[in-house]
């Protein structure tokens, strides 16, 4: 398992593809798995890697809380696609790994059991929370105006970046380009959110993080369903 070398474009592409249908490296909440991979990435992925950049900006917002995130941090080779081998940090990192060898045995098995138990507990909590939810879930329909920098902005790519944002309780709907003047068009896109899971502040933070394409975001309409 792994992402290849996360300090290279090829490794970041693997990460981007892996996150195309995921919000986090593992599970439904930020965890030490995200911290481990985040720390292996040397900086923000390029704007054309929408999924990786969206994930990077989101995990970066947990900088102060990363030590308290759930889970047990493992080596990079424990995460990612099973068909890819981790090669991040070869050389000096390999020497460090040699220094960390435990000549009197290993507690990897114990850590694995602990991680497994933690995952099972989180899954049980998640299922319990789902079971206790009321039959009627409060939802809202939101119409967003996403404005580009100028008339040369690739609006197809901008929309792709916006739709790459995924979250539990968020469903993207129809969209269209609306002229605003001087040859510039804004993206007007509909979404339905579960009120207790997704807010406009979260949407604005993640959409404007694609700063190579997005100048600003406004809520054009907000209706309770």
Swiss-Prot record:
Residue ranges constituting the GST C-terminal domain according to the UniProt record: 2-90
Family annotation (InterPro entries): eEF-1beta-like_sf, EF-1_beta_acid_region_euk, EF1B_bsu/dsu, EF1B_bsu/dsu_GNE, Glutathione-S-Trfase_C_sf, Transl_elong_EF1B/ribsomal_bS6, Transl_elong_EF1B_B/D_CS
Keyword list, A-Z: Acetylation, Elongation factor, Isopeptide bond, Phosphoprotein, Protein biosynthesis, Ubl conjugation
Glycyl lysine isopeptide (Lys-Gly) (interchain with G-Cter in SUMO2) cross-link, chain position(s): 147
Gene Ontology terms for molecular function: translation elongation factor activity
Comp. bias regions, Acidic residues: 96-113
Pfam families (alphabetical): EF-1_beta_acid, EF1_GNE
Functional note: Catalytic subunit of the guanine nucleotide exchange factor (GEF) (eEF1B subcomplex) of the eukaryotic elongation factor 1 complex (eEF1). Stimulates the exchange of GDP for GTP on elongation factor 1A (eEF1A), probably by displacing GDP from the nucleotide binding pocket in eEF1A.
Highest taxon listed in the record's lineage: Eukaryota
Subunit structure as annotated in this protein's UniProt entry: EF-1 is composed of 4 subunits: alpha, beta (alpha subunit of the eEF1B subcomplex), delta (beta subunit of the eEF1B subcomplex), and gamma (gamma subunit of the eEF1B subcomplex). Interacts with elongation factor EEF1A1.
Organism of derivation: Mus musculus
Residues recorded with modification Phosphoserine: 42, 83, 106, 174
Modified residues (Phosphothreonine): 88
Keyword Ubl conjugation belongs to the record: yes
Name of the protein described by the UniProt record: Elongation factor 1-beta
Lineage: Eukaryota, Metazoa, Chordata, Craniata, Vertebrata
Gene3D superfamilies: 1.20.1050.130, 3.30.70.60
Family listed: Belongs to the EF-1-beta/EF-1-delta family.
